[in-house]
Amino acid sequence: MNLPILTRVYFVGYNIFVELCFNSRISDYVGYGKVGYNMAFSLKGIKLPHRKNTAGMSAVRMPAPKMVTLLTSMHVGKPAKPVVKVGDTVSVGTLIAEQDGMISSPVYSSVSGTVKSIADAVISNGKAVPAITIESDGNMTSDESIAAPQINNKEDFIEAVKKSGIVGLGGAGFPTYVKFATDKKIDTLVINGAECEPYITSDSVTMVDRADDILFAIETADRYFNFEKIVIGIEKNKSAAITKMKEIAVKNNKIKVVVLPSVYPQGGEKVLVYNTVGRVISAGKLPADVGCIVCNSSTMANIARYIKTGMPLVEKVITVDGGAVKEPKNVIAPIGTPVGDVFDFCGGFKCDPEKVLYGGPMMGIAVPDLSVPVLKQTNAILALDKKETNTSKTTACIRCGKCTNTCPFGLNPAGISKAYKNDDVEMLEKLGADICMLCGCCSFVCPAKRPLAETNVLAKNRLMAERAKKKEGNA
């Protein structure tokens, strides 16, 4: 190589450094290691095209579907337990599956009609759970027992949130009441209005259309928790939502609206807490461990509805978009509605979709067919055309380090991928594969177009399975 000696030395040294990083032998100093993981969130993330085609479109209520299928697992934790049988008549808001365990959530009928079947359905994690199918009578009659709950103290408030069936509506699906039921000292409420994924506008539309409900839920929670700080974090590309949230902040001097850069994944819970209140949530910890409760803006709006009326979570505002959709809209759809019915309400398809997703293009889950139902945590359904799903050929890793540089947690996705392929569980542990939030930044920036995010999912599952095996062996 005909290069000056200093240049040659530099390249040799750099190649050795990259080799070490790739093999994760200096992970104590780069990214995740024994000392924790890189928390420089404000410097991490990626710029994505916004594609907020439905921004400014108020949500439109679709007609009652002919049939709904309500899964008993639309949340993190144990599936709910069916309490109805085939042939039962139900109304909107009738309890059809009760909470079963601490981390669980009840399920309510989203239409009035007759229970047609209770059968196992396979959910996204591959497990089979009971699904309750209800034939709608088209009347959408509310259950006569629906009434606003009596709330006199913190315990009553937590019980109301539990009975509402509300889970994290930003996509995570964690039962919301569990966040409020913590025994940790809580001093800060963070409202997540970041909505950082492309296309999705359901949260921002909710902040505009239901600002008063969000304020009501905030003030109700504050009455029993007496927060020192209440922060609403919104990306700067949502001007109408920012204006509305600032209007409610004027009515309560505890509320502060923090306008955040439009950087993905700004809405990640740990990222949001750091960028709004400056607190670091360590590996394996939750917001409550740093004195915070984090709730999505749509979650708060639905808490308000339940407290005011007693109507549990039976419908969802979802963004319907993508290049294959004829008339993109924000739609109010009964939970359990087949996604095909929702697309039909939006005029159907203008071309055959290449891919249909629950959620956004970064963290969304591919839908196998159009009969699958809208879930509690569904914030969007996208039908993408060929141009939007154009993929390049995967090539070998060039060890550029872009995946680590963009990871919000400073992880080493290339190293995790290598460890997974080698079935090196010890290295997966050291690399902190379980910490990955599955945001997809690594796959997005990878010049070799390697499926790093997909491998991270498999690596997390492998590591968790090994931990469970060890725990079982020690029991």
Where are these regions (language model features)?
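Conserved hydrophobic positions within beta-strands
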Residues: G113-V115
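Hydrophobic alpha-helical positions that pack around
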Residues: L6, F227-V339, F345-K350
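Short hydrophobic targeting helices and cationic amphipathic motifs
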Residues: L3-L6, F11
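Acidic low-complexity segments
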Residues: S117, V122-K179, D183-K184, S239
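Ferredoxin-type iron-sulfur electron-transfer modules in oxidoreductases and energy-metabolism complexes
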Residues: T378-T394, T404, P408-A475
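Gly-rich Lys/Arg/Thr-decorated short loops/hinges at beta-loop-alpha junctions or inter-strand turns
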Residues: G168, L189-D203, A324
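Short, well-structured beta-strand-loop connectors
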Residues: K85-E98, S117
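N-terminal, Lys/Arg-enriched amphipathic/low-complexity engagement segments
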Residues: G31-V83, T133
